[in-house]
Amino acid sequence: MEFATNRVTVNDSRSALSSTLLLSLIMSATLLEYSLSMT
């Protein structure tokens, strides 16, 4: 039982981390595009 709840917590933190990474990737890509269009 304890193992199952631990696995769920790991899954939640992993999905949160991946969504944060995806968001930062999109933001940096947008910033890169913006700075390229400025020049």
Curated annotation (Swiss-Prot):
Keyword Transmembrane helix assigned: yes
Domain of life: Bacteria
UniProt keyword terms in alphabetical order: Cell inner membrane, Cell membrane, Membrane, Transmembrane, Transmembrane helix
Localisation: Cell inner membrane
A Gene Ontology cellular-component term: plasma membrane
Membrane-spanning residues: 15-37
Magnesium found in the keyword field: no
Membrane-topology annotation of the record: Single-pass membrane protein
Reported function: Required for microcin H47 production. Possibly involved in a regulatory loop modulating its own expression and that of MchI and MchB.
Designated name of the protein: Protein MchX
Encoding gene (name): mchX
